[in-house]
Structure formats: C-alpha cells, structure tokens
Amino acid sequence: HKPPDLPVHPSQNHYTDTLGNCFCAAYPGLACRPVNRLDRNTSGLCVFAKSAYAANQLQYHLQKRYYAVVEGVLTGSGTVSAPIAREQESIIIRCVRADGKPAVTHYRALQHNDKYTLLQLRLETGRTHQIRVHMAHIGHPLAGDTLYGGRTDAIDRQALHCGRLILPLVQKTGTVTVGAALPE
C-alpha cells in the first residue's frame, strides 16, 4: 500500500526515497519491475513483479479500480473517451487533444454532497494522468489537484487512490483480488 507523497521510481529530486528503492532493499537479488505506476501523490496499491515474464503478463492483464473525490456533483455513471497528449510546452502536464493517444475512463458515482463526489473509476487505457485529465476535461477536477484545476481547500494533494487490483495468476488459471481501504 503506497502512501501519498512517495514516488514509485527514482526521478529528479527523488533518487533514493522511492517505493522502488524499498523494493530493492527488501529483495536485493531482484530487478525492480513496477507493473502499475502511481503518481507521487496518489495513494493505494502498487504491484512489483519478480521477473520480466511476470511483469509482462501482469501489465497487460491487470485490472485496476481507482477511487477519486472530484469537485461538483456527478450522479450515475459515465464514460470519458478523449485522446490525451502532452501539453506542448510541458514535460509534465497532459491535455485532451485530437492528435493524442486514445484514452477511455469509466466512472460511477458512489456518493456526493453539495461540493464533492466520490467516484469509482476503471481505465481501459493507462495514459499518464488519465483520470486527472479526463475528470478536469468534463468539468470535475480532482479535489486538491492544482495541476488540473482542483482546489486545495479540502485536501492538499489530488484525491486519488488505487483501491482494488485484480491480478491474473501468472503460472495458473484464475485471478487474485486485493484491496486497500480509502485513506482518511
């Protein structure tokens, strides 16, 4: 279970304080192979594979369920199908743009108040910042997500959590489902 504010892999300003470093310390004889990558401020489940074969199998068959708190009221369920590209003047920011890569996000409203909605989300594709970009695109940015228009009056990071993973058994048939409760 990855806490918020912990990068998955080394990057600028984060060379040793990552989940990958923790994995390497725990399993010194194995290569670090993250299967699903979470943004630094996203909490939840993150899977590492012990072999290249397992990483490949898991990467293409892993099913993920995310939970997000978005601004505004959404009810029911819906799908956002909008291509995502890198913002032309940024190496970090993504945007919806016609020449982007296809991206599909399914969401279902679980509960709401007059300011926020808790969503369960399922991705068909795995683009960088996909949930964050798609929710902002439909006018409901994630609470706390200042990069994509969210306000920080309720939370000081994007309110995004990977709460459930359905993993295929690599050398057997069947699946394993794991879950992580929403943080406070």
Q: For each of these PLM feature ranges, what is it?
A:
Residues H1, V47, A68, Y107, ...:
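Residue-level signal for inorganic ion chemistry
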Residues K2-Q88, K101, H112, A159, ...:
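RNA pseudouridine synthases
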Residues T18, T42, T105, T117, ...:
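Ser/Thr-centric signal marking residues that sit
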Residues V70, H106-A109, L142:
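Conserved hydrophobic positions within beta-strands
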Residues E71, L121-E124:
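A structural micro-motif recognizing beta-strand termini
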Residues S90-D99, D153:
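Short aromatic-glycine motifs in intrinsically disordered, low-complexity regions
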Residues K101, Q111-Y116, E124, T128-E184:
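Pseudouridine synthases involved in rRNA/tRNA modification
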